[in-house]
Amino acid sequence: MDASAAAAAEIAANGVLAKLEEEREAQKRYWEEHSRDLTVEAMMLDSRAADLDKEERPEILSLLPSYEGKSVLELGAGIGRFTGELAKTAGHVLAMDFIESVIKKNESINGHYKNASFMCADVTSPDLVIEDNSIDLIFSNWLLMYLSDAEVEKLVERMVKWLKVGGHIFFRESCFHQSGDSKRKVNPTHYREPRFYTKVFKEGHAIDQSGNSSELSLLTCKCVGAYVKNKKNQNQICWLWQKVNSTEDRDFQRFLDNVQYKISGILCYERVFGQGFVSTGGIETTKEFVDLLDLKPGQKVLDVGCGIGGGDFYMAENYDVHVVGIDLSINMVSFALEHAIGRKCAVEFEVADCTTKTYPDNTFDVIYSRDTILHIQDKPALFRSFFKWLKPGGKVLISDYCRSPGKPSEEFAAYIKQRGYDLHNVETYGQMLQNAGFHDVVAEDRTDQFLKVLQRELAEVEKNKDEFLADFGQEDYDDIVTGWNAKLQRSSAGEQRWGLFIGTK
């Protein structure tokens, strides 16, 4: 490197360092100002903090994996809202915060726990030393939003190393916009899109001394329900990750996010189905099917395979119900959360696998699922779960891809295999719901309606070809036209069917 290039590199490096120092100083000033009153209200920056805390703290703790007897590192521990709770069952808790008065207050409240220790330290400091592979759970609540993008990326690299294989990282952040009502002269907080955090943590990995590679696997990402319930606010989002060996299989979620429901694909589907929708007929079929549910204000609805949230917003806004939307695709839920901004409706979203997720018995009034269960191999087990989760008198409504009785053609069999679908004929599908315990089961073949919807959607895409090409390109246009024509052909031939199913508990 010549002298001028070396000098330029040094200037650039100094500029980066100066920017990082400026960031740390701004954050420190901000928290020194907001830590004068060492109260829950000051820490949560909200006048309703005491009431919110009663619901929010148990909810956050309920999302954590078992940490009984384990080592817990709490970053940005504050005055200890969570420190004492963690110390009750953990083997050891190290609580850390970069404001000395705050961590001292935490110690004065929680110092009687002999398994807790307290440290005043900045998580971004290179002087902070934590042994690799020594921690079972890293916990933070409102920390990363006070770090720059570069600081978040660096911290993730370090956290993956600190964590044991099989250990977990849980964090919760304010995304998109401010939540608390405290007045702030200056606000250096970074209100990011959730997908920033998802991307940075997905890219986090470590290689140990033996050359074994490990990475982070997303277990869940969801809104904090207490904020949805009390503030109609979906911007409080938490994530739970697990450190796994890089060879461990997570193929289905990867298939959904990298193949079938990659970001460009979702935007294409939304263009075809209408804003907020990625399933057959968009708002039109949603209105028709939701009307069959006789929803009442205050009821609770579970949407399995919620996609990007259009049906959930429709139900919440038009029927005043509380909707929980779950989807295995991280990309889908990211879009749903973005669509929720400013809507002020009671809808919460979560990245979750409906085959492993559990809810208490008798939780929901309605379980709703649109063109999703075709991905599920063990439908009888899922329907038994639906039956348990529903309140007595509750309803399930499902639309789904089906097939005609008999052996499928080679082409249709190849399509089913490529997509990983599990398809049944309409009658068998209805029988599975009956076998799970549902009464008054309606199992309707709606293939004629499916064909009309497909024809209308295809005609609309072809009519607006120039706009579509400008926004997406020829390859995406060809994929949609080819895909819709193939569905029309399979359905016209009677092989692919579309079913509507309703059952009552």
From Swiss-Prot:
Task: Indicate how activity is controlled.
Answer: Inhibited by phosphatidic acid.
Name its GO BP terms in alphabetical order.
Answer: methylation; phosphatidylcholine biosynthetic process
Tell me the superkingdom of the source.
Eukaryota
Q: Which CDD domains does this entry report, sorted A to Z?
A: AdoMet_MTases
Q: Which positions bind S-adenosyl-L-homocysteine?
A: G76, R81, D97, D122, V123, N141, V278, S279, G305, D327, D353, C354, R370
Keyword annotations for this protein, in alphabetical order, are:
Methyltransferase, Transferase
Q: Where does N-methylethanolamine phosphate bind?
A: Q260, Y261, Y269, Y401, Y415, R419, G420, Y421, K487
**EC number per UniProt:** 2.1.1.103
Pathway note: Phospholipid metabolism; phosphatidylcholine biosynthesis; phosphocholine from phosphoethanolamine: step 1/1
InterPro entries assigned to the protein according to its UniProt record, in alphabetical order = Methyltranfer_dom, Methyltransf_25, Phosphoethanolamine_N-MeTrfase, SAM-dependent_MTases_sf
Cite the PROSITE patterns for this sequence: SAM_PEAMT
Molecular-function annotations in GO: N-methyltransferase activity; phosphoethanolamine N-methyltransferase activity
Q: Which reaction does it catalyse?
A: phosphoethanolamine + S-adenosyl-L-methionine = N-methylethanolamine phosphate + S-adenosyl-L-homocysteine + H(+); N-methylethanolamine phosphate + S-adenosyl-L-methionine = N,N-dimethylethanolamine phosphate + S-adenosyl-L-homocysteine + H(+); N,N-dimethylethanolamine phosphate + S-adenosyl-L-methionine = phosphocholine + S-adenosyl-L-homocysteine + H(+)
- Enzyme class, spelled out: transferase
Q: Where, in this chain's numbering, is phosphocholine bound?
A: S174, S179, G180, R184, Y191, Y269, Y401, Y415, R419, Y421, K487
Q: Which family does it belong to?
A: Belongs to the class I-like SAM-binding methyltransferase superfamily. PEAMT family.
Tell me the function of this protein. Answer: Involved in phosphocholine biosynthesis. Catalyzes the N-methylation of phosphoethanolamine, phosphomonomethylethanolamine and phosphodimethylethanolamine, the three methylation steps required to convert phosphoethanolamine to phosphocholine (PC).
Q: What is this protein called?
A: Phosphoethanolamine N-methyltransferase
Q: Which organism is it from?
A: Triticum aestivum
| Taxon lineage | Eukaryota, Viridiplantae, Streptophyta, Embryophyta, Tracheophyta
